[in-house]
Amino acid sequence: GTKRVVVVGGGFGGASTAKYLRKLDPSISVTLVEPKTAFVTCPFSNAV
């Protein structure tokens, strides 16, 4: 049958997981669950 994966949370970890699951196996059905409609961040903004 079809492989189905649900990823809960669309932060860095969730979005990356969903992306790479699809890249590794395009036949996987990946659903990303995230309540927010936009993702805004400034990674490493506090790095000195």
From Swiss-Prot:
GO terms for molecular function: sulfide dehydrogenase activity. InterPro entries: FAD/NAD-bd_sf, FAD/NAD-binding_dom. Keywords: FAD, Flavoprotein, Oxidoreductase, Periplasm. The keyword Oxidoreductase applies. The keyword Cell inner membrane does not apply. GO terms for cellular component: periplasmic space. It is found in: Periplasm. It comes from the Bacteria. SUPFAM superfamilies: FAD/NAD(P)-binding domain (SSF51905). Its EC number is 1.8.2.3. FAD binds at V40, T41, C42, P43, F44, S45, N46. Pfam families: Pyr_redox_2. It catalyses: hydrogen sulfide + 2 Fe(III)-[cytochrome c] = sulfur + 2 Fe(II)-[cytochrome c] + H(+). Dimer of one cytochrome and one flavoprotein. This is Sulfide dehydrogenase [flavocytochrome c] flavoprotein chain. It comes from Chlorobaculum thiosulfatiphilum. The lineage of its organism: Bacteria, Pseudomonadati, Chlorobiota, Chlorobiia, Chlorobiales.
